[in-house]
Regions:
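Non-catalytic, mostly N-terminal accessory regions of nucleic-acid modification and defense proteins
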Residues: 1-200, 300-324
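SAM-dependent methyltransferase catalytic region
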Residues: 167-373
Length: 373
């Protein structure tokens, strides 16, 4: 019933696309977490029949937490070797909900999503087989937090070509595919080292011998920065860095690395450094919810590589997506629901104006200019 309603609302093409994206990113994320020793090797095959470990474990009684309805269905299927794909779909869905990083980065999956797992997902040459035996992604690649962003860019490349081929004005749902650009690493390093890095050295010239040899793209000014032009701050926690079109988080990740080194240099512990960066220093926004999820995951992976205590996702980076606007015809009713009592005319007027300004937030993103007096 939920699947039927979703198809009626969005159309079958968009529902297929949502399901494909959901499975692609979560399965890639699981493989990345496995390669970084943050979870058990749940996708690895245990036999020549390509039985995933998560299915083999369930057959031995080790079943992740799940709703009772799903558990009953799983128990009915477990003894049937012809239903491995169905078993896998139920188990991996439950695993995604149970694992803190996957759940908090990507959110809950719709009830019908497991029904849309491709039937050939476990076949020879299928997606899990490729993940387990790929010759194109090395172990070093799997340790790079940027990997999932690169794969997402490849994933949407066909859609991007379609959007550009039709020419003319982009529709709101086409903007993410059209504007996803993975900035080359040297450019990102140049940007970060000559902003955060330069500000830090201007305020802490004695640190130059520590960081200048590491910052290969730092540009030396022809003359020292005048005192009145130096951006002053009291503590590292005062340095706020925002990427307002953050995509999958490439620039945020580079900012994280540089800030982390600064915190360690100043004597903070690894855990303190990560928590302060997430709490105080980094902000990201993107109109593409998918990209926002990937940016969050990439930063969480980086945090776990510094200290595995972050595997419980007790703290998350502050990466946001632009909200889907409330239709104008529903604004008045929503305001009535929000207030226990009828708001004053001025408050009602201001909030109505705010909702109107947000009507194009999911297509304009951070270039949307808002002013409510």
């Amino acid at each position: 019933m939920a699947l039927y309603k979703r198809v009626q609302q969005k159309g079958i093409k968009e529902v297929y696309e949502e399901a494909a994206y959901t499975w692609f990113n979560r399965l890639v994320a699981i493989r990345i977490l496995m390669k970084n020793q943050l979870i058990e090797p749940v996708l690895d095959y245990v036999d020549a029949a390509r039985t995933p470990r998560i299915v083999d474990e369930a057959r031995m009684g080790r079943i992740p937490q799940m709703q009772e309805r799903q558990r009953q269905l799983l128990m009915e299927l477990l003894d049937d070797d012809s239903k491995i794909t169905e078993q896998f779909a139920i188990l991996v869905t439950a695993f995604c909900h149970e694992n803190p990083i996957l759940f908090k980065c990507f959110g809950a999956m719709s009830d019908y999503t497991e029904l849309l797992l491709p039937n050939d997902i476990l076949t020879e040459g299928g997606f899990i087989d490729l993940l387990n035996h790929t010759e194109f992604i090395t172990d070093a690649d799997f340790h790079s937090p940027e990997l999932i962003g690169w794969l997402y860019q490849f994933y949407i490349s066909e859609r991007k070509d379609e959007v550009f081929a039709k020419k003319g004005k982009f529709e709101a749902d086409e903007i993410p595919a059209a504007t996803q650009i993975f900035t080359p690493n040297w450019i990102v390093k140049y940007m970060v080292q000559n902003t955060i890095g330069r500000i830090y050295l201007d305020n802490n010239p004695s640190a130059a011998s520590e960081f200048k040899p590491k910052w290969k793209y730092l540009v030396e000014p022809s003359t020292p920065t005048p005192k009145e032009a130096i951006y002053k701050y009291k503590e590292l926690t005062d340095l706020l860095v925002g990427d307002l079109a953050c995509g999958s988080g490439h620039i945020l990740n580079e900012c994280f690395d540089l800030l982390y080194d600064l915190y360690i240099y100043e004597g903070y512990s690894r855990r303190e450094a990560v928590e302060y960066i997430f709490t105080n220093n980094l902000r990201g926004i993107d109109l593409d919810t998918r990209a926002k999820q990937l940016a969050t995951f990439a930063l969480m992976l980086k945090a776990c590589q510094k200290d595995s205590a972050f595997a419980d996702a007790h703290i998350l980076p502050k990466v946001l997506n632009m909200p889907t606007p409330i239709p104008q015809e529903q604004v008045s009713d929503r305001l009535k629901e929000f207030f226990r009592e009828t708001p004053s005319n001025q408050i009602h007027k201001d909030l109505t104006a705010a909702f109107e300004l947000m009507q194009e937030a999911d297509s304009l993103g951070s270039i949307d200019r808002k002013s409510v007096v």
